[in-house]
Swiss-Prot record:
Protein name: CTP synthase
Tagged with keyword Repeat: no
Annotated catalytic residues: C379 (nucleophile), H516, E518
Residues noted as binding ATP in the record, renumbered to the chain: S15, L16, G17, K18, G19, I20, D72, K239, D240, V241
Activity regulation: Allosterically activated by GTP, when glutamine is the substrate; GTP has no effect on the reaction when ammonia is the substrate. The allosteric effector GTP functions by stabilizing the protein conformation that binds the tetrahedral intermediate(s) formed during glutamine hydrolysis. Inhibited by the product CTP, via allosteric rather than competitive inhibition.
Family from the record: Belongs to the CTP synthase family.
Metabolic or biological pathway: Pyrimidine metabolism; CTP biosynthesis via de novo pathway; CTP from UDP: step 2/2
Enzymatic class: ligase
Pfam families named among the record's database cross-references: CTP_synth_N (PF06418), GATase (PF00117)
Source organism of the structure: Buchnera aphidicola subsp. Acyrthosiphon pisum (strain Tuc7)
Single Gene Ontology BP annotation: pyrimidine nucleobase biosynthetic process
Length: 545
């Protein structure tokens, strides 16, 4: 099977949307019956993003096999119907770590280890390993051309054209074409300079995708083509749109997929983008608008909750409801500032770490429970819901998590006992930690649902498999008293009897789960828990108008 590689780089500035562009192109090529995978190369020194602050990096997307990866892999999964693995994302730190381990073992037989060839060879090996079962491999290189961090990756993809043949490689460069409002002009000079930087590395781009506030007109595309040495048909205008789900059609309308298929000499059927037409239609046509509050601590960067926000939108599509998402800093609720919660039709508390903002989250849950507002807790959102119920309903004021208070008298939430490095009650002290990275309960785990529960009804099956990312769990030894007071456990893991789902029966909609359902939601199908949460929030709005 011939393998064709499409390398996507970015220029001028960061955050241009290379991930969305790669996912959208992948969706079009997948619709042409091509076997696609997408790889993200990240040029930072961290081994993976698992220990990076969400405020700096955005969410950590967890794959089925438990890899902690870049949020772009979430876009890849949602757009191309393909599950990602640990092979689909690697970093400079991961590559260097691998090479250094080999050097310590003596695998290099005394050679002097250098960026070229050892680091670049390791990068190429990882790309080839991930492409084993695909015939079209899209590779997104993080960062911006010109950054020193990206150089080993750029050199590796330059070499790949030599190794496998230039005819099997396409270089796509995504650049910014700014619109200067005061002059009423689009400026192409930044793109020209960015391409020159790429040429200095030895890479001639085959296709330019020009991100701009407005459509780049033909005469400007001709100018870019002339000075950047690419055909006019290969200069693609990517104007700003109000929905990422419009991008596949935008690229298809400019025949980007035709250009690629002709380049690779692929005889494949035309792409049918009907499913994307349906998504766009659902996004525009709704009967109701509701307000959902995400109560979190990382709201300075909305990308910290990217998959949660997308899953809420997907659920809105399925219910013909427009979801207005409000990101609320949990610390703003700490002084019982319930005014900011009054207009919400649903409250969601997502995953997180640490004790900052916990009081505000507890108060938000209490407000949702007492005022019969639909509540959805995810990961930490489930753990805090249990603590709130234990303190305010059962009357166990000492109930807490050892994450927030290692010496608490009633540790209803405690470290997972059978995980590596989790033996110390003083785990939060730096000196007692061995490794933070890669030591949580990660990836897909089976869960058994209770008969006659809401979750069983929504999933319509007894055994489900969902993705996890947590270091703390419910303490089963202390939970019986809480369960007896009315907080039902309706889902437990099959392996270790871990509490996975809780429900409150005397409430319109109060459900929380230890796993992360947002990672498996798609714009076409949504996710059953999110869909019913939004449905309940819609009912709440009607009841309180």
């Amino acid at each position: 099977m011939t393998k064709n590689y499409i390398f996507i780089t970015g220029g001028v500035v960061s955050s241009l949307g290379k991930g969305i562009a790669a996912a959208s192109l992948g969706a079009i090529l997948k619709a042409r019956n091509l076997n696609i995978t997408i790889i993200k190369l990240d040029p930072y020194i961290n081994v993976d993003p698992g220990t990076i602050s969400p405020i700096q990096h955005g969410e950590v997307f967890v794959t089925e096999d438990g890899a902690e990866t870049d949020l772009d892999l979430g876009h890849y999964e949602r757009f191309i119907h393909t599950k990602m693995t640990f092979l689909n994302n690697f970093t400079t730190g991961g590559v260097y770590s691998q090479v250094l381990k080999k050097e310590r073992r003596g695998d290099y037989l005394g050679a002097t280890i250098q960026v070229i060839p050892h680091i670049t060879n390791a990068i190429k090996e990882r790309i080839i390993l991930c492409s084993k079962n695909s015939n079209i491999i899209l590779v997104e290189i993080g960062g911006t051309v010109g950054d020193i961090e990206s150089l080993p990756f750029l050199e590796a993809i330059r070499q790949m054209a030599v190794d496998i043949g230039r005819k099997n490689v396409i270089y796509i460069h995504l650049t910014l074409v700014p619109y200067i409002a005061t002059a009423g002009e689009i400026k192409t000079k930044p793109t020209q300079h960015s391409v020159k930087q790429l040429l200095s590395i030895g890479i001639q781009p085959d296709i330019l995708i020009c991100r701009s506030e407005k459509t780049v007109p033909l005469h400007e595309r001709k100018k870019i083509a002339l000075f950047c040495n690419v055909p006019v048909d290969a200069v693609i205008s990517l104007k700003d749109v109000n929905s990422i789900y419009k991008i596949p059609k935008l690229l298809k309308n400019q025949k980007l997929d035709d250009y690629i298929c002709n380049y690779f000499k692929l005889n494949v059927p035309e792409a049918d983008l009907q499913e994307w037409e349906e998504v766009i239609y659902a996004e525009k046509n709704f009967n109701n608008t509701i307000v959902i509050g995400i109560i979190g601590k990382y709201i300075k960067l909305p990308d910290a909750y990217k998959s949660v926000m997308e899953a809420l939108k997907h659920a809105g599509f399925k219910n013909k409801i427009k979801v207005d998402i409000q990101l609320i800093n949990s610390q703003e609720v700490e002084n019982k500032n319930f005014q900011i919660l009054k207009n919400l039709n649903g409250i969601l508390i997502p995953g997180g770490f640490g004790d900052r903002g916990i009081v505000g989250k507890l108060l938000s849950i209490q407000y949702a429970r007492e005022n019969h507002i639909p509540y959805f807790g995810i990961c930490l959102g489930m753990q805090i819901a249990i603590i709130e119920f234990a303190q305010n309903v059962v009357g166990i004021k000492e109930a807490n998590s050892t994450e927030f208070d290692p010496q608490c008298k009633y540790p209803i939430i405690d470290l997972i006992k059978n995980r590596p490095n989790n033996s110390s009650k003083n785990y939060n002290k730096i000196e007692n930690r061995i490794n933070l990275g890669g030591t949580m309960r990660l990836g897909s785990q089976p869960c058994k649902l209770s008969a006659n529960s809401l979750s069983r009804k929504l999933y319509n099956q007894e055994i489900i498999i969902e993705r996890h990312r947590h270091r703390y769990e419910v303490n089963n030894l202390l939970f019986k008293k809480i369960e007896a007071a009315g907080l039902q456990v309706t889902g437990r893991s099959q392996k270790n009897n871990v509490v996975e789902i809780i429900e409150l029966s005397n409430h319109p909609w109060f459900l929380a789960c230890q796993f992360h359902p947002e990672f498996t939601s798609t714009p076409r199908d949504g996710h059953p828990l999110f869909i019913d949460f939004i449905k309940s929030a819609g009912k709440h709005k009607k009841n309180f108008i």
